[in-house]
Every structure is written in structure tokens, then in C-alpha cells.
Amino acid sequence: MRDSLTAEIVRLRQENSDTLTLYFVRPFDFVAGQYITVFIDGSSVREGKAYSLSSRPQEELASITVKNVGGEFSKYLCSRQVGDCLQISRAYGSFNPQTDRPLVGIAAGCALSPIWSILADAEQLTFLYFSHTSPEYQVFQDELAASNIKIQHFSTSAKVEEKKGWHNGRFDVAKIIAEVPSDAHFLVCGSLPFVRDVWQKLSAGGVGGERVSTETFFEQ
């Protein structure tokens, strides 16, 4: 029998046309960057699906941010209403390096969730290189704008006016390495090909594996 908790959804926020943040009363303590497993009764995926927490540990409500990709779990979660209950696990995972070094987040789309949780909770110098298809698909817009994180946005599809903090196309990992402190710790999160590509380029740029934490998102 699975060991699950019941969490009531108390707030919903539409991040963009296909992405929803679900807030629920936090039934556990957690470390920034951890994730939970969501279970669906009757699903053939009995082990559930993992979702990173997009909230900070000190906040009263916990949250997950879900992009509707048409799969069983994303469709289910993106159709929930306030008052519905989720069956979830406790938080787990060790993505957070818990270091005093400067932190550099490299993320694509919703994979920002665990990196945002870590950077927003950090007291040291923080950087974020964030790739999304276009500005209207950016998640956590208000929170990012109000944060002290040094952010560079990269729009991979829609053409944007290149101004401070905004760029067209994909980021250059070698340039990122040159721009940030030499002792920085890197947090990389995205699809498996994205994470593998960034990891390889960090390694080629002389960044040791002990200074890189990775998390892979699988869409479902």
C-alpha cells in the first residue's frame, strides 16, 4: 500500500495558456528544490508522477507548477478546481547543493520550478539563465521581477526586442561560464536532452561535476 497524504487545493494560478500552479496546504516540511509524487486513483501508473515544488519552504502554502502536455497526469492536474484534493507523497530529493557558493540556475520552461525555489530561498549571489519559447510563456513573472536574482531571458521562438535581460535564440554555455563567479555552483533543470547538452558544455568549459546539480523533467 502506498504511503500518501491528502492535500486540499486552496488556490490556482494560470501562469500562461497551458501552465497552471496549484497551491495546497503544506502537510510537510521540505528543502527548497525537492519534489513530491502525485498519485491518481485508478491510474495504470501506480508509482505516480513526480513534480517539483515551486514554493519556498517558509511559505504557508506549497505549490507545484504543471504544463498541460496532454498526458494523463498533466491533464488531470490542469483540470483541478479549488477544493479538490490531491493524493501526494512527502517531499524528497537532493537537488539543492546547500552551499554558500554563488548559484547559477539554467532552466527551460516549467523546469524552472525547483531552481526558482532554491534561488528565491538563497542568501548568496544568484543568477538565472531562463529559456522559454516566448515572453508570454514565462512562468513566475511577478516573482522573478521582484527578486534580487540576476536574470537573463532567452526567447527561442518568438522574436523579442533585445534589451537588458532579454535575448533571442539559445544561450551560450561558454559565455555563461565566463559571466559568473569562477566558484559558482550550477543548477540545471529541463528535459533529458537539455540537461545532457548543458552538462556536457559545462564540463567542456572546465566546470567540475562537483559544482553541477541536475534535475530532469519527464513530461506526462
Predicted stretch roles:
Residues 72-220:
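FNR/FR-type flavoprotein reductase catalytic core
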